From Swiss-Prot:
Pfam families: Hydrolase (PF00702). It is an enzyme of class 3 (hydrolase). Its cofactor is Mg(2+). This is N-acylneuraminate-9-phosphatase. CDD domains: HAD_Neu5Ac-Pase_like. It comes from Rattus norvegicus (Rat).
Length: 248
């Protein structure tokens, strides 16, 4: 780490600032209710949702040749067909997808204490939101949680040539804020993208949001710092700056 003070903080979005996993679970529960009450599915409803969750976790598509709506509707269509058999049911798949999507967006919110933290931090440093993912999906989340006003810039991986952990997207973020990599801290919950990316780009520090309290594998990227909640960040940044003051 360099000896300059922190001038900018890059934040991941999903499961760092907003509870994307929790919102997705709420969406799945609504779909289960729909399938059981309207279509009289029984345990198959949960099986279908479990299958979709697996497909989402393995999702891979080219954003310039494929529409995310089509891709995710197909996840539901395939899961229904695999579970129930018979002919494909695109209409039901669309109903499930849009219910899941709308429900989870409703529950993607910035908590009041997170808003307060961002507001206070921005008085001292520049803030940037750096999120991987499909452009449409991530922009919908950003709109849903109304976080735009808390950041000096927002960068969506799906709109760039490369996503995290490629160093190029971090350099782009630095250019937007007029800072050097050694001035910046990356905060996120994913070792393979947020932390590895910050290390690749030579940022001042990386902060891993480790909500589960698990220990990183020896083969995993090693963050400079680890906290259980993003709300611990202000105190950590003060500590980092204090170390700089003592070193110069």
């Amino acid at each position: 780490m360099g000896l300059s003070r922190v001038r900018a903080v890059f934040f991941d979005l999903d499961n760092t600032l907003i509870d994307t996993a929790g919102a997705s679970r709420r969406g799945m529960l609504e779909v289960i209710k729909l399938l059981q009450s309207k279509y009289h599915y029984k345990e198959e409803a949960e099986v279908i949702c479990d299958k979709v969750q697996v497909k989402l976790s393995k999702e891979c598509f080219h954003p310039y040749s494929t529409c995310i709506t089509d891709v995710r509707t197909s996840h539901w269509e395939e899961a229904i067909q695999e579970t129930k058999g018979g002919a494909d049911n695109r209409k039901l798949a669309e109903e499930c997808y849009f219910l899941w999507k709308s429900t989870r967006l409703q529950h993607m919110t910035l908590e009041e204490d997170v808003k307060a933290m961002l507001t206070e931090l921005r008085k001292e440093v520049r803030l940037l939101l750096l999120t991987n993912g499909d452009r449409q999906t991530q922009r919908e989340k950003i709109e849903a949680c109304a976080c735009q006003s808390y950041f000096d810039a927002i960068v969506v991986g799906g709109e760039q040539k490369e996503e995290k952990p490629a160093p190029s997207i971090f350099y782009h973020c630095c250019d937007l804020l007029g800072v050097q990599p050694g001035d910046c801290v990356m905060v996120g919950d994913t070792l393979e993208t947020d932390i590895q990316g910050g290390l690749n780009a030579g940022l001042k520090a990386t902060v891993w949001i480790n909500k589960s309290g698990g220990v990183p594998l020896t083969s995993s990227p090693m963050p400079h710092y680890m906290v259980s909640s993003v709300l611990e960040l202000p105190a950590l940044l003060q500590s980092i700056d204090c170390k700089v003051s003592m070193s110069v």
